[in-house]
Each structure stands twice: as structure tokens, then as C-alpha cells.
Regions:
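N-terminal amphipathic/hydrophobic targeting modules at extreme N-termini
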Residues: 1-18, 23-25, 35, 44
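Amphipathic, positively biased hydrophobic alpha-helical segments used for protein targeting
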Residues: 13-14, 26, 46-49, 183-187, ...
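Generic N-terminal simple sequence motifs
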Residues: 13-14, 40, 70, 82
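Short, Lys/Arg-enriched N-terminal segments with co-localized hydrophobic residues
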Residues: 40-54
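Extended alpha-helical targeting/anchoring segments
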Residues: 52-401
Length: 401
């Protein structure tokens, strides 16, 4: 463990908590390792020894033990992170990498989710368009004739992690997206007209073996490198070298970006209002005939934008903080998003789906918020839609449970 000492001038607590004991003011602090320090207020200056760098690191002995289960072993170095931010680190990563991701949880203006996840320099890219699967690795690109779902399962099995207590819920794996058109890979009876589809892949996944995780609750971060379990002694050495490089990146000073006004061009749709209304009428007909329960009808909007997506995401996370925030670049495609909805979650053998039906704008005050909530929860149409979505989610979960 490396340590550093710094001065705390009188009146400057550096995050320590004042405690009154028999009329004397003390500064009382419990560090990450359970140690306690206390100083009387008469001292003009005190010195506090802070664990600046390494809090905990996976040893070779621990790695050998974990390797017995096969797959990949998460080699972890845990650091203090009270002076590092996810956005600051992302501003460094995006300068030298074109494949990365940032996943955050911002549940309100003043509330943060516990973990933020960052990954870069993936092992491979797996994508498909119209059932043609492409596998892109650091050695090159090739087409695969295997079924996409089988291919995904095989890679997940190869890099499966053992369960290690105390680690974040995600320590490496696939990050990317599945489009709505991906349903035709799972339901053979469904086929979509390729001429009506976008140019984006039906799914696009990056496999990350290196992940940085911020723990906002403990003010620490996890540097994680997944080492293949076979030949663990050699892969452990490489993992330590990768951790050293990741630590150097985390310690790199971050310059504040230059701010400027963004300009958004005219917004256009991929369909006319007449076509939109015509298709809505067709959907209503199918519902009345009993052919479908619901339809998620969408249109694509586009506009020019003179800033990069990172600048857009910085604004998005301030103006629309949500439970699920995302920024990712998959080579030639960039995605930024914000969503409050848990579409599907798998923890152990428990599947959770929490569809959202019905919305109201946020109130300007807490009282107005409560009134809008009351109106939403007693709206007959919203309740009917909610019950329908719960029923559909139950049916979907029932197919795989």
C-alpha cells in the first residue's frame, strides 16, 4: 500500500466529521480500512495519512484459486477515487479510442446510482445484419456461419467470471445493443422487409475484458482485467501490466473542455404526416380485428449537430438524469441515451421486467408532483395500458422461465 501525508489546516476538515467530546471539538474519521483518527481543535495544523493509491489488489494466490472454476478470472485493483470522475476519465479515453462505453445511473438531480461503468479497447466486436454475422477481433474480420445466439453464448461461456464477494455486479462482458428487428432471430415466423430497415446492424456487441467501475458510495474505483483461467500465472502477469496502464490513465490530469453554444439544424422525419396517419389507421384496424394487442409505431428523426456526442451527453445527464444513462461508441456508430425503464434484468436466476406505461410531466414543486402522480395513477386509460404491459411481460418471462 502506498501512502501520502497532507496537512489539514484548522477549520478545514477535508471531509472529516466534527464531534464534541467534553466541550472539545474533535475531527473524527473512519477510513476505508476501518481506521480512526481524531484531532483537537487547538492544533494549528494536523497531518492525516491517506491511502492515496491501492486499497486492495487480487493476489496471484487468489487468482489461482479462482481459476479452478475455469473461464476468466477478474484481476482487481481497488483505488480511492474521490478526485476522479467518470466524465473526466471518459474525456481522456475518447481521445485515443473509438470503441468504448459509459453506463451510469442518475436517478435525480441530487441522487446518484452507486456504480458507473467504463470500458474501452474491447477484445472483439460481434454484429449481424440480415442474418449475416460478422466477428471482428484485433487480428482481423471474418464472417461466421454460426447461429448468432449460439455464438454469443459460446463467448460468454469462455469469459464467464466466478462470483467474487465485494465486486460490482458487472466485471466484464458484452456491451452494445439489440435492435427491435432482432426479434426475427428468436421468432422464425417473423420476417421484416430489408428495404424498410435502417442501415444499422440488427445487433452490435463489444466484448470488454477491461472495465473501470466507480463506486460512488465508497468513493473508490475498481480497475478490472479479466485473465483467462488456463495458464493463469502468465495471464495474471499481463493483467497486472494492464492494471498499471489503467492506473496511469486514471491519474492523468484532465483539462476542462472548452464550452461553446451548440447548434441544432432543422429536424426532419423519415415519413410524411399523411403516411404516418395512414399507418396508425392500419394499426387500429389490426387491433379491432384481434390480430395484435399493441404496436410500438416509430419514426426516425434526424438533424445536423455541430458538436460531438460527448458534449451532447454532458447536457443530457444534467437536464434529463435517469436510472439508465448510456454513452457508447462502436467504431462508426455512437449512441447516447437516457431511460427510466428496466426493460429486463437478470440477477442469478431471477428475471425482472418493469415496463412503464403512461407518463406525466414533472411538477415545478413537490406538491404539483404529487398531484400529477395522483392523476396518473387514477387514469383509466393509463391503468389499462399498464395492466396490458404487465401481462405481456409475464408471458415473455414465462417463455424462458
Amino acid at each position: 500500500m502506498r501512502c501520502t501525508a497532507f496537512a489539514v489546516q484548522q477549520g478545514g476538515t477535508a471531509g472529516l466529521s466534527p464531534v464534541l467530546v467534553r466541550g472539545q471539538a474533535f475531527l473524527f474519521y473512519q477510513d476505508l480500512l476501518g481506521g480512526y483518527l481524531a484531532f483537537v481543535n487547538q492544533m494549528p495544523a494536523v497531518f492525516y495519512v491517506k491511502e492515496e493509491i491501492i486499497v486492495k489488489e487480487t493476489s496471484l494466490t487468489e487468482a489461482r484459486c479462482l481459476a479452478e472454476s475455469g473461464g476468466a478470472v477478474p484481476i482487481v485493483r481497488q483505488l480511492l477515487a474521490d478526485m476522479v470522475t467518470p466524465l473526466g476519465l471518459m474525456s481522456l479515453i475518447r481521445k485515443d479510442h473509438d470503441r468504448y462505453f459509459l453506463l451510469e445511473s442518475l436517478e435525480g438531480i441530487d441522487a446518484r446510482g452507486r456504480y458507473s461503468f467504463i470500458g474501452y479497447d474491447p477484445l472483439l466486436r460481434l454484429s449481424a445484419k440480415d442474418f449475416a454475422v460478422t466477428v471482428e477481433t484485433r487480428k482481423g474480420t471474418q464472417k461466421s456461419g454460426k447461429a448468432p445466439l449460439d455464438l454469443i453464448r459460446n463467448y460468454l461461456k469462455e469469459y464467464q467470471n466466478p462470483k467474487v464477494p465485494g465486486l460490482p455486479p458487472f466485471t466484464g462482458g458484452f456491451v452494445g445493443y439489440f435492435s427491435y428487428d432482432f426479434i426475427q432471430y428468436c421468432e422464425p415466423s417473423l420476417r421484416f422487409d430489408p428495404k424498410k430497415a435502417t442501415d444499422f446492424p440488427d445487433f452490435d456487441l463489444l466484448l470488454f475484458d477491461k472495465v473501470i467501475v466507480f463506486d460512488a458510495f465508497k468513493q473508490t474505483l475498481f480497475l478490472i482485467v479479466n485473465a483467462k483461467a488456463d495458464a493463469i500465472d502468465e495471464t495474471y502477469k499481463k493483467a497486472i501490466r494492464d492494471l498499471d496502464a489503467m492506473e496511469a490513465l486514471v491519474k492523468t490530469p484532465v483539462l476542462a473542455p472548452q464550452e461553446g453554444t451548440a447548434h441544432l439544424g432543422p429536424i426532419s422525419s423519415n415519413q410524411t404526416r399523411e403516411l404516418y396517419n395512414e399507418n396508425i389507421a392500419r394499426i387500429k384496424h389490426f387491433i379491432r380485428e384481434g390480430d395484435i394487442f399493441q404496436a410500438v409505431y416509430s419514426q426516425c428523426f434526424s438533424a445536423s449537430y455541430d458538436k460531438d456526442l460527448f458534449s451532447f451527453y454532458r447536457v443530457l445527464r444534467r437536464t434529463n438524469p435517469s436510472q439508465y444513462m448510456m454513452l457508447m461508441k462502436l467504431g462508426d456508430t455512437e449512441i447516447a441515451g437516457s431511460s427510466p425503464e428496466t426493460l429486463i434484468r437478470l440477477e442469478g436466476r431471477t428475471i425482472t421486467s418493469m415496463p412503464i406505461a403512461g407518463t406525466r410531466r414533472r411538477g415545478r414543486t413537490e406538491k404539483e408532483d404529487k398531484a400529477l402522480e395522483e392523476d396518473l395513477t387514477h387514469d383509466a386509460k393509463e391503468l389499462a395500458e399498464h395492466n396490458m404491459l404487465v401481462d405481456l411481460a409475464r408471458n415473455d418471462v414465462g417463455k424462458v422461465s
